[in-house]
Design a protein with these regions (language model features):
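Acidic/polar low-complexity surface segments
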Residues: 1-10, 51-66, 133-145
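Extracellular beta-strand-rich solenoid/capping regions of secreted or surface-exposed proteins
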Residues: 6-19, 38
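Right-handed parallel beta-helix
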Residues: 20-31, 42-57, 71-87, 95-110, ...
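Noncatalytic linker/hinge segments flanking ATPase motor cores
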Residues: 66-68, 167
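Catalytic domains of carbohydrate-active enzymes that cleave complex glycans
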Residues: 102-104, 126-215
Length: 215
């Protein structure tokens, strides 16, 4: 369908770089790709009671990362809401952890909340609920997806979360954990089921594992 995709504007509301012991709280943003991102050399950050809605951009790679821990450590995002994003609660490449996303809610979601890119470690998703056409929670072998991501992360924990698709895979020499999760029940619409199947098949094909999606 049609949507607003102009990109001639700022895309990140708050970017924390080389910052320690800081917080962002009680903020609502509209039309930004990203509400808050943390980068390397960033520690002890809290983002809480945040809202990120109606981003204006193309719905494609590199866009719509609502809450993005991209290299930070000891970062906590809690009680955050988003709509119409792709990766709501997401890690960047080789993010060391520990980090956590707690009590988050996303709707009209177009991609996964996950360790993204490659080999991040040590993150908790606790009571994260996602709804939408391609909403999912994943810690997977992303194979040749993107720029050749491969294994996205290790020592990830998904605790009491819900999404139309939840896919947690075990990387070599490490573990990922899925505890108390609900799939499909949170959003059992035809659109969500179709998106879940498409996402699942993409991961299975690129990681070359023998798994089949059961409707």
């Amino acid at each position: 369908g049609e949507y607003c995709c102009d990109e001639n504007h700022a895309n990140t509301f708050v970017a924390l770089r080389t910052v320690e012991n800081a917080w962002v709280r009680n903020v609502s943003v509209e039309h930004f790709d990203c509400c808050v991102t943390t980068t390397s050399a960033t520690k002890y950050i809290t983002g809480q009671d945040l809202s990120a809605i109606n981003p204006i951009s193309q719905i494609t790679g590199g866009r719509r990362y609502a809450y993005h821990i991209n290299g930070g450590q000891m970062c906590l995002f809690q009680r955050c809401y988003s709509s119409h994003h792709r990766h709501e609660f997401v890690l960047g490449a080789t993010t060391p952890g520990p980090n956590a996303f707690v009590d988050g809610y996303g709707e009209m979601t177009f991609a996964s909340s996950e360790p993204h890119h490659r080999w991040s470690a040590g993150c908790l998703w606790d009571n994260i609920v996602l709804k939408g056409p391609s909403a999912s929670l994943m810690a997977a072998n992303r194979g040749s997806m993107g720029s050749g991501h491969g294994w996205a992360g290790a020592q990830m924990v998904f605790w009491n979360c819900a999404a139309p698709l939840i896919l947690v895979m075990q990387p070599p020499t490490a573990q990922n954990f899925a505890i108390g999760l609900q799939a499909t029940e949170v959003d059992n619409s035809k659109e969500a089921r179709s998106g879940a199947k498409s996402t699942f098949n993409s991961i299975v094909n690129t990681s070359m594992i023998d798994m089949k999606y059961k409707d």
